[in-house]
Every structure is written in C-alpha cells, then in structure tokens.
A protein has these predicted regions:
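Active-site HxH/HxHxD metal-binding segment of metal-dependent hydrolases
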Residues: 1-87, 115
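Residue-level signal for the nucleotide or nucleotide-sugar donor/cofactor binding architecture
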Residues: 5, 141, 221
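Short, contiguous alpha-helical
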Residues: 12, 99, 234
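C-terminal regulatory/interaction regions
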Residues: 190-251
C-alpha cells in the first residue's frame, strides 16, 4: 500500500497519467480486486502447509482483501515504464532500473547528470526490504531474483551516487550497502541449511531468520519471507520439501 496508495488520488487530483511498470500495475489491480471476496482455498492450504495455527488462519481470513480498502482506486489505464527506459522529468533525464524480489517489477530512477538514485524499496540504508512468497505463486523464488537485482544495481550505478530511499534518510555508499544486503541473505541461507538437518516447518525457522519477535501483526510477512528462503534453497538443490498430513516439512 505504501507503494501505490495515493497514486490514484494524484492522478485524479492533478489530471495526470499514472506511469509505472506493467507487472506491478496488474498485481495491484489483482490485489485490490480481492476486497469483499471469499478467501481462496489455495490461500488457506498455503498457510496451513506452512504450519500456521487455526487462530492464525482465522486472523488471515479476517484480514483478507484489506489492500483494496486502504488505497485509492487506480486509474483504469496507465503508461508503462520498463527497465532501460529513459524518461524526462522537469527537463532532466532519468534511467529506469528494474529490481525484482520485493515486488515483481520495482522501478528505480537514476539520473547520471545529478548522480542521484531514487531507489524506492530496492535499496534502503538500515533495514532490508521484505522478500516473500505469496499464495498466488507458492513455488516462487523471489530471493534469488532479489539477489540478482542487487548485483545488477552495483554494475549500473556508481559507488558515490546519492541514494534517495523510500524509508530512512538519503545516504552514500550504495555498493557497500548492496554487498552488505547480499551477504546478509547468503549468511541466512547458510544458517537455514544447517538448521534443516532435521525436518522443519516454515514457522519453525523463524528464530534462524528473524531477531525480532514474530506476533499476530507480522506473522504473515514472516511466513512469506521464510518460504522465500526455503524455496531458494530448494531451487539451489540444497534442501527438499515433503508434505505430511497437509503440513510441508523441509530438510
């Protein structure tokens, strides 16, 4: 919601077109369409396999479709921007750089003349952005997408670029920060692989991946991020997943 929540309001208020990536536009329309709808059984199966309790499943059902209720309606048409495009804003040229993993097609804007990077959530100074799997694509591997995007960003922007993030203050040291993020996730994957010496559910791996307490307010995000790490290990051929009595176990 913090990506797109006021886009519809701005477009209507100032009579301007919405410019964004195709996949993110369609994904937002899809999420907004869930408002008022019943929870798909695939979604319930997804979180049941992950090991959520009946109380947590009930909590998810009660919150299902909230996205559309907290954003302004998106325009029914938009102008697509994609990786490699160069767009003009107030007479300055900005290169569009795609990042994947946090969203499907996150667009950063880089001005070579100003040496500025509007990084959105693709590069933050303190925290790492959420990289999670959702019920609509349960076998997705967004973490490898995220890591590849970080590596590509190192090649596309200079080390001394001034980064304007979506959260936190502007900062310098883009390459160093990107390498820190990559190393953080690779270390988490190594720890997780060791932890899976015996079969574990998705919810069992929270202590390996998260320092903060997981409660009713963040367990869905934690579950999605845990599955992202597990799916990454599966795709790398390092762990396997087996279903036993509707619960998924990883080892």
């Amino acid at each position: 919601p913090d990506h797109i929540g006021l886009a519809g309001w701005f477009a209507k208020k100032f009579n301007v077109p919405l410019c964004m990536s195709r996949t993110d536009y369609l994904q937002c329309r899809l999420l907004a369409a869930d408002t008022g709808e019943y929870v798909p059984h695939e979604a319930i199966d997804f979180y049941t396999q992950a090991g959520l309790s009946e109380k947590q499943i009930k909590n998810y059902i009660e919150r299902f479709g909230f996205f559309g209720s907290i954003i302004h309606k998106l325009p029914d048409a938009y102008n697509r921007i994609k990786h490699g495009d160069v767009i003009s804003i107030a007479g300055d040229e900005w290169e569009c750089i795609e990042g994947r993993g946090h969203t499907m097609e996150h667009i950063c804007l880089f001005s070579k003349a100003k040496n500025l990077l509007i990084s959105g959530d693709q590069l933050l100074p303190k925290i790492t952005s959420h990289v999670g799997v959702f019920p609509t694509e349960p076998n997705a591997n967004p973490l490898d997408d995220w890591l590849e995007s970080c590596k590509r960003l190192i090649k596309l922007v200079p080390e001394d670029v001034l980064v304007l993030p979506a959260h936190g203050r502007p900062f310098l040291g883009a390459h160093k920060r990107l390498k820190t993020i990559i190393n953080h996730h690779e270390e988490s994957l190594n720890k997780l692989e060791e932890f899976l010496a015996t079969p574990k559910r998705s919810v069992d791996v929270f202590p390996v991946l998260f320092k903060r307490e997981i409660d009713d307010g963040n367990f869905l995000m934690a579950t999605g991020e845990s599955i992202a790490h597990l799916n990454c290990l599966i795709e790398r051929g390092l762990v396997s997943r087996n279903i036993s009595e509707v619960i998924a176990f990883y080892e």
